Amino acid sequence: MSRSVALAVLALLSLSGLEAIQRTPKIQVYSRHPAENGKSNFLNCYVSGFHPSDIEVDLLKNGERIEKVEHSDLSFSKDWSFYLLYYTEFTPTEKDEYACRVNHVTLSQPKIVKWDRDM
């Protein structure tokens, strides 16, 4: 009986240790096709390498949250870090700015990465 209790405690301790590892997300913002003003495209925000899995991701147009956004299922890499892709259809113009805002437990404040139309 005491051996099974010891194994159960050991298992719980090892599981709780997994939660202690925190990794900051890497954020990449890019369009599916080269940017052309007035031409429909897709804006992508790829967030990877983060742990734990709880994360908030928003796509922004001129600092305002874009409502119609889709995303992939939460997936994990072989190192147990997580990744997601958020995307939306958009039509770039000369004056509009686009960005991705990410909030995660490893960040002291939400991180905003702007889309560079020349990338």
From Swiss-Prot:
One of the Pfam families matching this protein, by short name: C1-set
Residue ranges constituting the Ig-like C1-type domain according to the UniProt record: 25-113
GO process annotations (BP): amyloid fibril formation; antigen processing and presentation of endogenous peptide antigen via MHC class I; antigen processing and presentation of exogenous peptide antigen via MHC class II; antigen processing and presentation of exogenous protein antigen via MHC class Ib, TAP-dependent; cellular response to iron ion; cellular response to iron(III) ion; cellular response to nicotine; intracellular iron ion homeostasis
Modification Pyrrolidone carboxylic acid occurs at: Q22
PTM comment: Glycation of Ile-21 is observed in long-term hemodialysis patients.
Glycosylated residue positions: I21, K39, K61, K68, K78, K111, K114
UniProt keyword annotation of Acetylation present: no
Superkingdom of source: Eukaryota
Keywords tagged on the record: Amyloid, Amyloidosis, Disease variant, Disulfide bond, Glycation, Glycoprotein, Immunity, Immunoglobulin domain, MHC I, Pyrrolidone carboxylic acid, Secreted, Signal
This protein's GO CC annotations: cytosol; early endosome lumen; early endosome membrane; endoplasmic reticulum; endoplasmic reticulum lumen; ER to Golgi transport vesicle membrane; external side of plasma membrane; extracellular exosome
Protein's cellular compartments: Secreted; Cell surface
GO MF terms held by the record: identical protein binding; MHC class II protein complex binding; peptide antigen binding; protein homodimerization activity; structural molecule activity
Main localization of the protein described in the UniProt heading: secreted
Impact after mutating W80V: Increases tendency towards amyloid formation
Secreted recorded as keyword: yes
Signal peptide (residue range): 1-20
CDD domains attached to this UniProt entry: IgC1_beta2m (cd05770)
Known function: Component of the class I major histocompatibility complex (MHC). Involved in the presentation of peptide antigens to the immune system. Exogenously applied M.tuberculosis EsxA or EsxA-EsxB (or EsxA expressed in host) binds B2M and decreases its export to the cell surface (total protein levels do not change), probably leading to defects in class I antigen presentation.
Family: Belongs to the beta-2-microglobulin family.
Subunit field text: Heterodimer of an alpha chain and a beta chain. Beta-2-microglobulin is the beta-chain of major histocompatibility complex class I molecules. Polymers of beta 2-microglobulin can be found in tissues from patients on long-term hemodialysis. B2M alone (not in complex with HLA-I) interacts with M.tuberculosis EsxA (ESAT-6) and an EsxA-EsxB (CFP-10) complex; the tripartite complex can be detected in the host endoplasmic reticulum. The B2M-EsxA complex can be detected in patients with pleural tuberculosis and is stable from pH 4.0 to 8.0 and in the presence of 2M NaCl.
Entry protein name: Beta-2-microglobulin
Species, as recorded: Homo sapiens
